[in-house]
């Protein structure tokens, strides 16, 4: 996993793993290195992360992920 330096502060490891997993799964879906990097950019607060949520059919969990990246 690539830790984006924009993620600062104290983190819940389980929460971080869950967010990171979205980016890993999205990378596995598309097999493009920039997907994994861009997905994590801005501590997961970006359009690529949101698109990954949609592409992985996780829209039912969108509110949970949105709250997580605002912590």
Curated annotation (Swiss-Prot):
PROSITE patterns: CHH_MIH_GIH (PS01250). One of its GO terms (biological process) is neuropeptide signaling pathway. Pfam families: Crust_neurohorm (PF01147). Signal peptide: none annotated. One of its GO terms (molecular function) is neuropeptide hormone activity. InterPro entries: Crust_neurhormone_CS, Crust_neurohorm, Crust_neurohorm_sf, Hyperglycemic, Hyperglycemic1. Its main location: secreted. One of its GO terms (cellular component) is extracellular region. Keywords: Amidation, Carbohydrate metabolism, Disulfide bond, Glucose metabolism, Hormone, Neuropeptide, Secreted. Produced by the medulla terminalis X-organ in the eyestalks and transported to the sinus gland where they are stored and released. Belongs to the arthropod CHH/MIH/GIH/VIH hormone family. This is Crustacean hyperglycemic hormone isoform 1. It comes from Macrobrachium rosenbergii (Giant fresh water prawn).
């Amino acid at each position: 996993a690539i830790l984006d330096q924009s993620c600062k502060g104290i983190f819940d490891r389980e929460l971080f793993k869950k967010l990171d997993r979205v980016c890993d799964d999205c990378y596995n879906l598309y097999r493009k290195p920039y997907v994994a990097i861009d997905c994590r950019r801005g501590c997961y607060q970006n359009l690529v992360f949101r698109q990954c949520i949609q592409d992985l059919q996780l829209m039912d969990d969108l509110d949970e992920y949105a709250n997580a990246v605002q912590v």
